[in-house]
């Protein structure tokens, strides 16, 4: 089991001894226990373990008890806090003052004791001290002996906890750049100030010659390599596609392709070891290499220097981003193609919020209904009727994105790893063809994964962009994968690279200018790449972004569903403008 941060639960109480405090002790502690149970029963970490909550040893009525609670939370590895109360408490004495913890306060809506009054008072204190907190207040009054958590309160607690756990999990980890800037792509000009100040992360970097050194000096688990090759032969190499993209003089011979398979399998093992380390290497005498870089996310430059000379990174990237490999079902890694760290961060956000594999894609083409009709003679229908966006990547997309995993009703899904079945794994592998890489672009060869995503999956496309003078901003577009007429797909796909994986995406339209039509979504997208997560997670992303002080510049989430710190209300009634002003005022957490 990995070690994850915990969520601290702070039961606060009216400190007046002699009747008041005593009458509230049991009620207040029961609320804290209910919150802890709600979180642990509903939220999991990436390895499937329940998110653990730590409750203060006793209720908090005066500042000494606040300090004792803070000391315990530091000792126990807490990364965020939720304060709960059913009554009046002393605001500045009982509040959480840790500047790095995301924090929320639930004030019980009851008439016997003024929990709502404390909530308002302590939130004013948080705003005044520059320590934004999320206020949680139930819509309906509850009786004093009712310790159940209303549905609206539970939703906010879980939304906060999900995002707060993501913030805490990132803190102290690394982003590993394997290589440097790819083809001048701005997202791969990695900005260490952003990672340090906004995410609390380090930046690690290796030259790609390190991969070759480990290959040539045998610095990898040779037993695992044999196992990996046997698995690859059985499930991937058997699905090697026809080499139709390359001219005869550029096609590699069979023995060269066999060598490429061996090469890319070693690449994957080494890239994983670089990210997270491998105790097996210590047994082999490579103590330094065994450590890894403590990377929660990484990027692989590939183009051009590597791919002009060596097999490309499509196979290792695709499988690292997938929820399984030769060692079985596991948590997906986060690896950004072309070392686009901005997209890698968006993938990391999606992964930490959902525990699912993330799709990395070029946001390649908007196809209008008129253009499709002109090119194919056929019309788009259903969800695709207003046009589609072609999401496609150079063969390095997670195999989970094929949509071959099915839920109980037979619908395509991308599952958390603990819900994946062996049948799901085999279906994803069977649906994936590994085409020899197009050597006009990838001179060194390699193999690109190819599949067509199943339609009907709810997904969220997102992107982090860095803007000079402004800082980071986040874009969010909820929508669906769609299936189109096979003849339409064939003709459109042949106009790009048919050896690469395709996802046809339709955003949910609304009255916001960037979402008035599908074209506007494409036209307002801030970069060439997007990260795509299963599910409509825009609400969670907005909550997470507010914790990190990253304004959201584009989204199609219902404004009534947005949950940000209460202090954001002081920055005006226009939610987007208030978000920008609040993020600018408070600045990054770790600066």
UniProtKB/Swiss-Prot annotation:
**Binding positions for Mn(2+) per the UniProt entry:** 338, 362, 529
Keyword annotations for this protein, in alphabetical order, are: Carbohydrate metabolism, Cytoplasm, Fucose metabolism, Isomerase, Manganese, Metal-binding
Primary location group: cytoplasm
Q: Which family does it belong to?
A: Belongs to the L-fucose isomerase family.
CDD domains the record matches: L-fucose_isomerase (cd03556)
Q: What does this protein do?
A: Converts the aldose L-fucose into the corresponding ketose L-fuculose.
* Name used for this protein in its record: L-fucose isomerase
Q: What is its EC number?
A: 5.3.1.25
Entry keyword Ubl conjugation: no
The protein's required cofactors: Mn(2+)
- GO BP: any one term: L-fucose catabolic process
Q: Where in the cell is it found?
A: Cytoplasm
Q: What are the GO MF terms of this UniProt record?
A: arabinose isomerase activity; L-fucose isomerase activity; manganese ion binding
The active site lies at: 338 (proton acceptor), 362 (proton acceptor)
What top-level branch of life does the organism fall under?
Answer: Bacteria
User: For this protein, what reaction is catalysed?
Assistant: L-fucose = L-fuculose
